[in-house]
């Protein structure tokens, strides 16, 4: 009994539907090096949300970043982040290229718990949160301290892929928004976590196909899987020199007044005082010695004359007798 073409097509469609799964892409990029992140993944295929979350926790545990950008882009799929779509993400790709650690996961079976990730960063790195919910960089206020920040960005949903022109336009706007927010950061040490909270149906793709067409089935394959990244090295050493902060002295305080008063006091045996006024002191010493010598000479002369007169008087008196 032969199966009709229509039934065969329907059977294939049902088989694919049953085999498909819901997934979201996840991109993690850290300006500072975090070794061994990929050890948390199970092979190169679709990953469980727990594996992706453990990868992020391993990165966060080091608290090597001053800012953590947790970006939720509803409707984002792998096809939006391939090499072919590079022109839509000029600024994000620039930050990826600068990062020391980058991991791209094309498919995670289910959305990540971004609220849990936010709280984990806050509790682990003693951070505080800034929220961006209206696609406006002005929602990120000015920094008044050096505390670690979690900048949670909830972007507007992407238009459907049936209207690619509009979808690409919105992606470019969001890429520009990310650039504006990063430029506001006072520190270059940041981490980017980009994903979606809206899983999309994905048909399984054989590993052989994925490996043969990485530009199509990997997140920004040319950057994330660049051969230079096989060796985990810190790419931003020049930013990481430890510099002691300059603390401005207290102004108009009792402590400063007392310190200045002590500095203004003159101490006779102060070595610095003698060193600073060496020429003046030598001049005074010479003048004193000169005056002393002059007075001593006068005294000696006076004594000599007095003794001479007495001797002369004694001699005259003896002769008269």
UniProtKB/Swiss-Prot annotation:
UniProt keyword terms in alphabetical order: Cell wall biogenesis/degradation, Endoplasmic reticulum, Glycoprotein, Membrane, Signal, Transmembrane, Transmembrane helix
Signal sequence range: 1-23
Entry-listed glycosylation sites: 42
Transmembrane regions: 280-300
Localization, UniProt: Endoplasmic reticulum membrane
Cytoplasmic side: 301-321
Stretches in topological domain Lumenal: 24-279
Record-level GO BP terms: (1->6)-beta-D-glucan biosynthetic process; cell wall organization; fungal-type cell wall biogenesis
Membrane association type: Single-pass type I membrane protein
GO CC term, one of those recorded: endoplasmic reticulum membrane
Superkingdom: Eukaryota
Entry function: Required for normal beta-1,6-glucan synthesis.
The family this protein is said to belong to: Belongs to the BIG1 family.
The name this protein goes by in its record: Protein BIG1
């Amino acid at each position: 009994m032969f199966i009709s073409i229509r039934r065969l097509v329907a059977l294939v469609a049902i088989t694919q539907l049953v085999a498909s799964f819901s997934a979201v892409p996840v991109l993690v990029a850290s300006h500072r090096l975090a070794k061994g992140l990929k050890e948390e993944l199970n092979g190169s295929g679709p990953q469980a949300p727990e594996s992706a979350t453990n990868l992020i926790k391993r990165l966060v545990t080091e608290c090597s970043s001053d800012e953590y950008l947790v970006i939720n882009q509803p409707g984002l799929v792998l096809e939006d982040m391939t090499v072919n779509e590079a022109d839509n993400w000029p600024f994000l790709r620039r930050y990826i290229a600068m990062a020391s650690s980058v991991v791209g996961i094309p498919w995670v079976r289910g959305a990540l718990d971004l609220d849990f990730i936010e709280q984990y960063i806050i509790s682990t790195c003693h951070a505080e949160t800034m929220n961006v919910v209206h696609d406006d960089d002005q929602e990120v206020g000015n920094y008044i301290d050096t505390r670690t920040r979690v900048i949670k960005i909830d972007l507007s949903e992407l238009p459907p892929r049936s209207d690619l022109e509009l979808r690409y336009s919105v992606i470019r706007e969001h890429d520009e928004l990310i650039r504006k927010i990063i430029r506001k950061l006072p520190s270059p040490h940041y981490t980017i976590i980009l994903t979606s909270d809206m899983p999309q149906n994905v048909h399984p793709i054989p590993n052989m196909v994925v490996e043969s067409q990485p530009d199509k089935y990997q997140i920004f394959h040319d950057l994330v899987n660049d051969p230079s990244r096989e060796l985990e090295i810190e790419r931003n050493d020049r930013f990481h020199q430890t510099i002691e902060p300059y603390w401005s002295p207290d102004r108009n305080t009792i402590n400063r007044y007392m310190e200045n008063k002590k500095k203004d006091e003159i101490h006779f045996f102060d070595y610095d005082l003698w060193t600073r006024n060496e020429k003046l002191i030598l001049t005074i010493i010479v003048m004193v010695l000169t005056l002393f010598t002059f007075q001593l000479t006068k005294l000696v002369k006076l004594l000599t004359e007095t003794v001479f007169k007495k001797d002369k008087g004694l001699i005259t008196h003896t002769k008269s007798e």
